């Protein structure tokens, strides 16, 4: 008779030796993300060259507050969607967080106006290209292939107990390049605000 404890050990060892696979369809040459041993996040690259102008301030407005004349200008920060040249299928029960690189604000003058971007698990179609949604602090130039942001995966709030255990026991993640993700396109920003 097979010892249940032995079977359990074998199952745990097999799960532990498993890596969570992220399928990646490369849409622009040179944009395949690369796992490296330095740092916990995965760099993403711009798929295009872009000239981004500095934000423009409006006309000077003067207001009197408590008898004091105060001048101010409204500044509009435009939002840019920089294509990252990849579409990905995350493992079930996971989502991705996109954030600026630590040097991004200083070197590129870009920031994410909402702090970070979230890529849901359902955004996994062949044409569901990831984007870096950002605003400029100054005029800047981006070239295709520049590392402009980074991402990591984490459990989603809908992750099952099995997906949580798999994450806990996995030996990391693996990026697998594919020609076809085999999923319907979800589109970007399609859910609206109402």
Regions found by a protein language model. Name each.
Residues 5, 10-194:
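DUTPase catalytic domain/fold
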């Amino acid at each position: 008779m097979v010892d249940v404890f032995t079977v359990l050990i074998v199952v745990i060892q097999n799960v532990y030796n498993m890596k969570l696979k992220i399928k990646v369809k490369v849409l622009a040459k040179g944009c395949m993300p690369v796992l490296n041993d330095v740092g916990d996040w995965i760099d993403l690259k711009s798929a295009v060259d872009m000239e981004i102008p500095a934000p423009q301030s409006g006309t000077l407005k003067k207001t009197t507050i408590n008898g004091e004349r105060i001048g101010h200008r409204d500044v509009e920060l435009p939002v840019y969607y920089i294509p990252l040249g990849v579409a990905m299928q995350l493992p079930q029960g996971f989502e991705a967080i996109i954030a600026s690189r630590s040097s991004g604000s200083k070197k590129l003058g870009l920031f994410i106006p909402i702090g970070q971007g979230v890529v849901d698990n359902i955004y996994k179609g062949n044409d569901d290209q990831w984007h870096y949604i950002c605003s400029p602090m100054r005029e800047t130039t981006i070239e295709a292939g520049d590392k402009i942001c980074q991402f990591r995966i984490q459990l989603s709030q809908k992750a099952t107990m099995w997906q949580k255990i798999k994450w806990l026991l996995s030996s990391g993640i693996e990026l697998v390049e594919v020609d076809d993700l085999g999923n319907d396109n979800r589109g970007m920003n399609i859910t609206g605000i109402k």
